[in-house]
């Protein structure tokens, strides 16, 4: 499937509406690639691309699954449910939004990307770039 680069607020609105603000969805996979590596001469290379790819599935077929690709990820703050926590892991609401310097995926409906206080204590992903695609199910 084709990747769609988020370039403006209309692109963000389209993604949020297409995926129903992530209602009744689950994070089913996350893959983090730092870009750093050690070569065969044992020399370390620090590319620091910090790419994070997150795959979601939801209780709907139109579309069923999407993948978000966060480039140059700055922050990941998520809470994962464990069976002993007796909490649900489904997402009731989430959105993608942005400010002048970053893109955000957050569970907080009232999240204001321009308010620095909103960056603390809430579940979110913050990155310099964002693209998405409908994922193969």
Kindly give the residue locations of the regions a language model identified.
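Surface-exposed, interaction-prone regions used to assemble/regulate multi-protein complexes
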Residues: 1-137
């Amino acid at each position: 499937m084709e990747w769609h680069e988020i370039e403006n607020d209309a692109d963000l609105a389209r993604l949020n509406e297409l995926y129903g603000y992530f209602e009744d969805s689950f994070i089913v996979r996350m893959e983090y690639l730092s870009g750093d590596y050690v070569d065969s001469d044992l020399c370390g290379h620090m590319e620091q691309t910090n790419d994070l790819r997150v795959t979601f599935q939801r209780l709907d077929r139109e579309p069923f699954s999407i993948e978000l690709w966060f480039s140059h990820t700055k922050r990941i703050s998520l809470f994962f449910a464990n069976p002993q926590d007796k909490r649900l892991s489904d997402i009731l609401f989430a959105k993608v939004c942005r400010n002048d310097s970053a893109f955000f995926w957050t569970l907080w409906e009232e999240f204001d990307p321009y308010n620095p206080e909103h960056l603390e204590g809430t579940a979110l992903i913050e990155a310099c770039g964002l693209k998405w695609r409908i994922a193969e199910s």
